[in-house]
UniProtKB/Swiss-Prot annotation:
The glycine cleavage system catalyzes the degradation of glycine. The P protein binds the alpha-amino group of glycine through its pyridoxal phosphate cofactor; CO(2) is released and the remaining methylamine moiety is then transferred to the lipoamide cofactor of the H protein. This is Glycine dehydrogenase (decarboxylating). HAMAP family: GcvP (MF_00711). The modification N6-(pyridoxal phosphate)lysine is found at residue 702. Belongs to the GcvP family. Its cofactor is pyridoxal 5'-phosphate.
């Protein structure tokens, strides 16, 4: 047989779509005899790694491939090395009780976790509605007007708040930001990292004592503070506004159910995390951060923003709003470099709020506060000083000289407390804290329970306003209702469980169940990121293995896993280059060369590290114009910091001059940043650290199988050569990482999903990884050959080959017929497919990436759909249909529109089943959405109940 079908099959045979027979057909169609010949034809000889017995250079040190069963057993052994202690450390990370219906219905459900960012809103209405619920939840609890669709974590959300206030406060020329001295230490570190390249001066102050002297553009406060203290910031906000400053407050959303919302006392910005709303700590992540603003600042928001609009029939519909703020359009002038953040976790948090409702959240908060008050009362009864009388969940105990003794005593009882210094211990209570935990905590201090103490939320700070009154937070309080709601939403969306998602530059490959299974195991999921290292030897082994494997695969000398998105990897890599130049006395090296074809994130990241972007032209064939590059290098020889170059290029080809490009930059004293977005075309073939790169970020959510989650989570680790290693990210609470800049809230970023990539590499092995890469390239070339006569392939390499993706040029057809790339994308939904990437990197084109995971049947079905669409375009071109009324312009077609009055020149059958009745399809929930209407009439929270009538 072509493929073994027993459970003993090698994992690579489960992961790679085409079997032996299908692969032979693919190779025959593209004119090569083998995958090895394909490698020699597609990849420049100068960078191609040699292969011995099927194993490429660099990958020989990878362990032999494991079966799915053995990989899970190995992970279980590592999990068994960890200790699941009771975490009472706090600092923004808390144990939480995830409702099982959400674990099974979202986190373990491929209909949710294999979806992509909702760029095609008509087939993404389910997760867009869920994200609108998230935005409404955040807006309600913070008292703000507009919230975005998630941030990467709380600390980076604080940093984005800082830069947002500086942009928005046009009346202030001051570079100073006043920061609450009671802020979380990880947030303090991220703020310092982000502030320095931008020339922002951080001034720390105890806001309970008022504001410091002098001018400043903003104030950033924490509520409650890191010490647990609750402070009424009303006077601070009033004073700041009187002095022309804006105010951002980092507020705990569970506390906000009991404490007056910052928006109600005048805050301009709120930021924080939604982790404790049902999202496990996961040794640091992933969790959904949040950012909310007053309506006047909505166009300054970073990241995605879901808004309400209408479709072609006037029905309510959801879409991503105000996209012109973002890096993929505004490039170096964008509000931020972040793309999508933490959609999957935002949906969990939103559904947690829906499941519990306002009264349920309030009851949880009161229980948490009662536990903390019981701790405080017991300590005081034993004569131990409680530093703050006003707190929500965290008690600060003064134990002169005995902090570590107390922490050790608690540890012997299975509880992790936080030693603030030698004289103080913090005890943080959460949803999972029990009365038995309180008894053990007090025993560690030599105390015992004395009943709940006095109220610790002062009456003048108590919340009186309503929140979460929308039906989205009242209808789904039973498991039956929630189960059906989750199913109804997911049925509106195309994810990988329904069809291929051929998005170029996105690498929508299989997210195997065996890779995913461990993320909910408590030995990984219930670990606090600042837990003692003795609790997590298994997790640290996973991290160490993964760092070494990625070093082997990329050819670099060291890897950091801290960046929790590709954008953050870019930032960390460029920051390493900046600090390297500074250490060498080359402070004037601030120019970053970026090809005109680059993803907008590159330019946005360069600006964030204080670099000046100089654009390098591309040739008509898509390659970097080496003559223009040399001219730009000569022009900026003394100030050149780096070049950022994606390889293979964003045009989907292997540029044969890559080694010369790297050498030219190095000769001028610059560094080479090789963007790893397209690493799925390099693994096992060539290593950026060996063909000229000094640093790269990798996208574990593309190449290494972490799912996209509808728009996050992602992991963007960076690999560096040895001279940049001293500048890899550090962390104030993880001294083993060194003193480099902190780029994320947790030392190892989104650590709990690193087990996915560990499992993928462990199960594929060296030969499997190389086979996957070459199969992805073969499939892309097959599509290019099949579709070229219908939609010209815009760019190919020297041998007429593309890399792992190809660009289909529709511009001629649009000019001749008026049918646009948007029309084709929407029409594909009628055929049951998600559209390829539209108009990137070239307007008026579609970029197709099949990955290695799709079999030939699915690839052919996609090609057949595209060919059928071309025939429809020809009917428009011939005049049979007008450009205003044809199945492409009318797409997508809903079931509702088919049963309404029909006055189109094409049949209902052609509208609904253009591919015939055999292929199952997701019916679009709405017709084509009016984007301009949504931006003109910005609504970013759940519509009022009347809108549903």
């Amino acid at each position: 047989t072509d493929r073994m079908t027993s459970t003993a099959s090698a994992f690579v045979d489960r992961h790679v779509g085409p079997d032996t027979t299908e692969l032979a057909r693919i190779l025959d169609a593209i004119g090569v005899d083998s995958l090895d010949e394909l490698a020699r034809k597609a990849v420049p000889e100068s960078i191609l790694d040699t292969v011995v017995d099927g194993v490429p250079d660099g990958l020989a040190t990878l362990p032999p491939a494991l079966s799915e069963h053995d990989a899970l057993a190995a992970l279980a052994d590592l999990a068994g090395c960890n200790t699941v202690a009771t975490s009472m450390i706090g600092l923004g990370y808390y144990d939480t009780l995830t409702p099982p219906v959400l674990t099974r219905g979202i986190l373990e459900n491929p209909a949710w976790y294999t979806a992509y960012t909702p760029y095609q809103p008509e087939i993404s209405q389910g997760r867009l509605e869920a994200l609108l619920n998230f935005q409404t939840m955040v807006s309600d609890l913070t008292g703000m007007d507009v919230a975005n669709a998630s941030m990467l974590d709380e600390s980076t959300a604080a940093a984005e708040s800082m830069t947002l206030m500086r942009r928005a406060n046009r009346g202030s020329k001051s570079p100073r930001l006043v920061v609450d001295s009671d802020i979380f230490p990880q947030t303090k570190a991220v703020l310092a990292t982000r502030a320095e390249p931008l020339g922002i001066e951080l001034v720390y102050a105890d806001l309970a004592d008022g504001l410091p002297e002098g001018d400043f553009f903003g104030v950033l406060a924490q509520l409650p503070g890191a010490s647990g203290r609750l402070v009424d910031h009303t006077a601070t906000i009033e004073a700041a506004h009187e002095r022309g400053a804006l105010v951002a407050v980092g507020v705990d959303l569970l506390a906000a159910t009991l404490v007056t919302a910052p928006g109600e006392i005048g805050a301009d910005v709120c930021f924080g995390t939604t982790q404790r709303f049902g999202v496990p700590m996961g040794y640091g992540g992933p969790h959904a951060g949040y950012l909310a603003v007053r309506s006047g600042h909505s166009r300054q928001l970073p990241g995605r923003l879901v808004g309400v609009s209408v479709d072609a029939d006037g029905h309510r519909a959801y879409r991503l709003a105000l996209q012109t703020r973002e890096q993929h359009i505004r490039r170096e002038k964008a509000t931020s470099n972040i793309c999508t953040a933490q959609v999957l976790l935002a949906i969990v948090a939103a559904m947690y709020a829906s499941y519990h409702g306002a009264d349920g959240l309030r009851a949880i908060a009161r229980r948490v506060n009662t536990r903390a008050r019981t701790v405080a009362a017991g300590l005081q009864a034993a004569g131990i000083d409680v530093v703050h009388a006003e707190f929500f969940d965290t008690v600060l105990a003064a134990v002169p000289g005995a902090a570590h003794t107390v922490v050790d005593a608690a540890k012997q009882r299975g509880i992790n407390l936080r030693p603030v210094d030698d004289d103080h211990v913090a005890i943080a209570c959460d949803e999972a804290t029990t009365e038995a935990h309180i008894v053990d905590v007090l025993a560690a201090f030599g105390a015992e329970p004395a009943g709940p103490g006095a109220e610790s939320v002062p009456a003048d700070c108590a919340r009186t306003s309503e929140y979460l009154t929308h039906p989205a937070f009242t209808r789904y309080r039973t498991e039956t209702a929630m189960l059906r709601y989750l199913r109804a939403l997911s049925d509106k969306d195309i994810a990988l469980d329904r069809s291929m998602i051929p998005l170029g530059s996105c690498t929508m490959k299989l997210n195997a169940t065996a890779e995913m299974e461990s993320i909910t195991w408590p030995q990984f999921a219930r670990q606090h990121p600042f837990a003692p290292s003795t609790d997590v030897p298994g997790l640290l082994r996973v991290i160490a293995d993964l760092e070494q494997w990625l070093v082997d695969i990329t050819g670099y000398d060291a890897v950091s896993l801290q960046p929790n998105a590709g954008s953050q990897g870019e930032y960390a890599g460029l920051l390493a280059i900046r600090r390297y130049h500074q250490a060498n006395g080359d402070t004037g090296r601030t120019v970053c060369l970026i090809p005109s074809s680059a993803h907008g994130t590159n330019a946005a990241s360069a600006v964030m590290v204080g670099m000046r972007v100089v654009v390098v032209a591309c040739r008509p064939n898509g390659d970097v114009d080496v003559d223009d590059l040399r001219a730009k290098i000569a022009e900026h020889a003394d100030t050149l910091a780096a070049i950022m170059i994606t390889y293979p290029s964003t045009h989907g080809v292997y540029e044969h001059e890559i080694s010369d490009i790297c050498a030219a930059v190095h000769d001028a004293g610059g560094q080479v940043y090789v963007d790893g977005a397209n690493l799925n075309a390099l693994v096992g073939l060539a290593r950026p650290g060996r063909f000229g790169g000094d640093v790269s970020h990798l996208n574990l959510h593309k190449t290494f199988c972490i799912p996209h989650g509808g728009g996050g989570p992602g992991v963007g680790p960076i690999g560096v050569r040895s001279h940049l290693q001293p500048y890899l990210p550090g962390h104030p609470l993880a001294p083993q990482l060194g003193d480099g800049p902190t780029v994320a809230g947790a030392p190892y970023g989104s650590a709990s999903i690193l087990t996915i990539t560990w499992a993928y590499i462990a199960m594929m092995g060296a030969q499997g990884l190389r086979r996957a890469t070459l199969t992805a390239i073969a499939s892309a070339n097959y599509i290019a050959r099949r579709l070229d006569e219908y939609f010209p392939v815009l760019y190919t390499g020297d041998n007429g080959m593309v890399a792992h993706e190809c660009i289909l040029d529709l511009r001629g057809l649009t000019k001749d017929t008026g049918v646009t790339v948007d029309d084709v994308a929407k029409r594909l939904a009628d055929y049951g497919f998600h559209a390829p990437t539209m108009s990137f990197p070239v307007p008026g084109t579609l970029m197709v990436e099949p990955t290695e995971s799709e079999n030939l049947e699915e690839i052919d079905a996609f090609c057949d759909a595209m060919i059928s669409i071309r025939r429809e375009i020809d009917r428009v071109g011939s005049g049979e249909w007008t450009v205003e009324d044809n199945p492409l312009r009318g797409a997508p077609h809903t079931a509702q529109c088919l049963v309404a009055d029909w006055n189109h020149p094409y049949s209902r059958e052609l509208a609904a089943y253009p591919a015939g009745y055999d292929r199952p399809k997701v019916w679009p929930a709405v017709r084509r959405i009016d984007g301009a209407h949504g931006d003109r009439n910005l609504v970013c929270s759940c519509p009022p109940i009347e809108a549903f009538a």
